[in-house]
């Protein structure tokens, strides 16, 4: 009888939350995504470059010749854009087991097919370095094909959710994140809701082939970006909505502090040619997300609700698909906020890459890239 009462109670709560989220879809409900002062709602005018038979272009990279972009997609492939009319072509993949990897979006097969997330080219060699959520840090040559694993563990602990990277070519090292020791990529929302703090920030020395943990205890370690002068590296902590700065040289070398606190959940971070940083927010931080992350009783209730992951994601993101990109200075000051407040064109963005007067915009969920003219 007690279990029946609890089930009925949770079902009622889920129904109430669903109604509140539906009301939020008008932009005025209590769970609606918050407004950001000074933001410009310009992304509805962005163009889209559709993917054919693929989805989730999480990360974006251009090769040393300026060709591309290249994107990693949900079925484990890395695609190259060859422009109109050629469109997209297969460039590389992270798993040799491709027999079952034909569906554009199949989270249950990610551990078989691979899920390439962060992408970075070595400007000298043309090699593409890949952070695959399931297969660790990999590399593939300029001709593409099957990527080769470089490292799958650090200090005796295997990677569980390799996420993003950046390359310091002068020091011959790669900085990258392992998001969680408990959750895999297809459980990303559970990692956030459980306030998991087992993420790591790692340095891989290409000469010694050794991986060293630089930071640990991170709450969803995510995007990585090296500063223009290489004096510091930034690492995104998604759950706390913060970006951390780890000093690599100078009097503060080896120490870290908060570089920026953001109004939403940051994913990847990318530096532009001026040394500024573009941060993509998966979503803004509304009331539901705040309560889930700060009130234990509310979080415990949410985790017990009999609702689908899709409905839970809708609750967490405020019921309105939207897109937010923030440009930060080298000191962490907010310079610009660009949005698609109602998700008319872009939504749930994962990365913003600035190149030749355009912003190329990825998403872990949608079947296209966004392109916005600055």
UniProtKB/Swiss-Prot annotation:
One of the Pfam families matching this protein, by short name:
SSL_N
Identify the keywords attached in UniProt to this record, alphabetized. Glycoprotein, Signal, Vacuole
Specify the domain of life of the species encoding this protein. Eukaryota
Signal peptide segment: 1-18
Q: What are the glycosylated positions?
A: 50
Single GO cellular component annotation? Answer: plasmodesma
Cellular compartment(s)? Vacuole
| InterPro entries per record | 6-blade_b-propeller_TolB-like (IPR011042), Strictosidine_synth_cons-reg (IPR018119)
Q: Which family does it belong to?
A: Belongs to the strictosidine synthase family.
Name assigned to this protein: Protein STRICTOSIDINE SYNTHASE-LIKE 10
Q: Which organism is it from?
A: Arabidopsis thaliana
